[in-house]
Amino acid sequence: MSGSSTYVPKSALGRWFENRLPIVGLVHSSFVVFPVPRNLNYMWTFGAILSFMLVAQIVTGVVLAMHYTPESTMAFSSVEHIMRDVNYGWLMRYLHSNGASMFFLAVYMHIFRGIYYGSYKAPREVLWILGVIIYLLMMATAFMGYVLPWGQMSFWGATVITNLFTAIPVVGKSVAIWLWGGYAIDNATLNRFFSLHYLLPFMIAGVVGLHVWALHVVGQNNPDGVEVKNVERDTVAFTPYATLKDAFGLAVFLIVYAWFVFYIPNYLGDADNYNNANPLVTPAHIVPEWYLLPFYAILRAIPNKLLGVVCLFGAIALLAFLPWLDTSPVKSAKYRPVFRVFFWAFVADCIGLGWLGSQEVSDSTTLAARLLAFCYFAFFLVVLPLLGLFEKTKPLPASIADAVLASGAPAAQPAE
Amino acid sequence: MIRFKNIALAPAAVAVLLALGAVSRADDAAPAPAAPAAAPAPSAATAPTPAKAAAAPNANQGAPTPGDNAADEASQPSPPRQSWSFSGFFGGYDQAQLQRGFKIYREICGNCHRLSIPFRTLSDPSGPGFSEAQIKALAATYQVTNDTPNDKGEIFKRPGIPSDLIPPPDAYPNPEAAAATFGKEPPDMWVLAKARKYERGFPWFIFDALPFVQYQEVGADYIHAILTGYTNSKDPSWNLYFPGHKIAMPQPIADDAVEYTDGTPAKLDNYAQDVTAFLYWAAEPTLVERKKTGLRVMIFLIVFAGLLYLVKKKVWAKIH
């Protein structure tokens, strides 16, 4: 679908340059004439939104790093210095801290959209796995970023997560000491987390490049899950069609983002993180940021520490195996009535796990978390493999164009 | 594809949410114990609340219960919701209130609590708004330890200047000294209002994030509640709203403790309101600028999104 660049430079200089580095042609073929299925809905705007959020996080983060002090006795006050004394420091900091949440909100929409419409299925397996790697890198980046303000929840969250590594048999303790740069979380840990928090976003950007590259090789999936058969009939040009749609989606997303930044900037954060880190005072209730809560609930639900850690990472790793766990040849949930029910149950399951992860541990929450964790794994390991064998799917449309016409869109004028 | 019937549903959904939000407010007004227990959800999720309530009386049997509050002992009421000038879309600080609040900090809280902000910030026009001369005079009443020694190599004290941080209390120059007296160090008050909360519980925490019913002032309500929560005359360190009720800080302020010169009645509730508002400003001095900027950003984004939608619709109309 791509690679067929139709770009013709208009000026002599443009031709000279294009013969030496065809980068304008690359942009032209990737973001101007690139064929986009014409039936995409607004769930497909999250790719552009995520690209924007990555850039926004890097830009605000670079500015914050100019004023932040990664030193354990000064980190907390340096964040307050940014909030009070730096011009628009409060804006940069609230954009960055809420930006992390918005980034995850968008990535969860993106991932659930991928699951609903079977976007991981052939030929998009590599594209999907690259996405899972980005998600993992995002979680590592967000976790280390949350440590930097050096509040109580930063410190104790870091304690809980780094202690997970001590569960590894034989070498666990050594690994944890290596991670900490000492025998406990301290200045050395803060320093390396700052360094890595600055590094990882650029690694994400690199993998995003591969993700987009892979996307432009195999083309986008679409709500009907049938591949493009006739480029003329089934697709529209990326620009202006997808560009404008993405721009509108992004603008609406920015309204939500701005709402959080300007009116409820501390809603998603924990109040305890405005208390300076104190290794001698354990908070009554240690909770990670909301986007990690479902995994935290799975971790706490398992009584054995090593097994808990295995399940925690397994819950994420399973995503990478989705292309082979889902045995159904039909991609879109639109034509899979039973899968659709299980999908929404899975979404509810994840939200339920998230809520349980935010609650204090009691017998009933542990029981509920075990039940929901079991359902989480069952969705991947039992439901998806079996559904493909037994589910009676609805007939697929012959082509994307047929699906569009069938859904009652007015076909007044022919395509351009 | 744009589905118009879905778009038409959106305002209806918003209306339902707002109505629910209003209900959540009505609930706040009633001085009932923690609301989430009333949420009728059949899932296991709500189970912990009754379990906790059942466990609480047992836990209290060992401890001596204060006589006139035995009924309250088992429950932990949520702080009653106050109306703050700095809440809502256009909320800002009330200058006179912050000035009264600063007076209370200076005469009462400042005896034990640090407030690590520079004197100069007290001239913030959207905050307490003291004049430059007032700040200079105020700073000079404090003795500040100089950062560097003098030419004889001696550490010395000098009168404060506006760029100095408000120095720690004379009686407790370091946190350890205060901890030795009270058993716990009095927290620095500069971000206190953002560092305190109470659990809102399901489903109220959802409404707290929504436009028009947003609720960001949990920390302020908590501090106000603590200051007015010393309701047991026999035990000065018993607080109705403190988790577990036993608080290290003995009742700090009561009626007539601070003289008001602007005619505001010298009542505990007014003191609590004023000093809490002051502490909220100290924790979030950029709130007014933030909300003002936010309004412009919102108007821009909504208009911009609307225009983009129209352009998008026009361009896409060609291919339908």
Feature locations, PLM:
Chain B
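Acidic, glycine-rich loop-and-strand cores that form catalytic or ligand-binding grooves
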Residues: 184-235
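Extended, hydrophilic extramembrane loops/domains of integral membrane proteins
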Residues: 241-243, 249-284
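Electrostatic cytochrome c docking/interface patches
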Residues: 68, 76-103, 114-128, 132, ...
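Juxtamembrane interface at the cytosolic side of transmembrane helices
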Residues: 290-293, 302-320
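Bacterial N-terminal signal peptides
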Residues: 10-19
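C-type cytochrome heme c attachment motif
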Residues: 103-115, 163, 167-171, 185-194, ...
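Long, low-complexity intrinsically disordered segments that are proline/alanine-rich
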Residues: 27-72
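Sec/Tat signal peptide C-region and signal peptidase I cleavage site
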Residues: 22-26
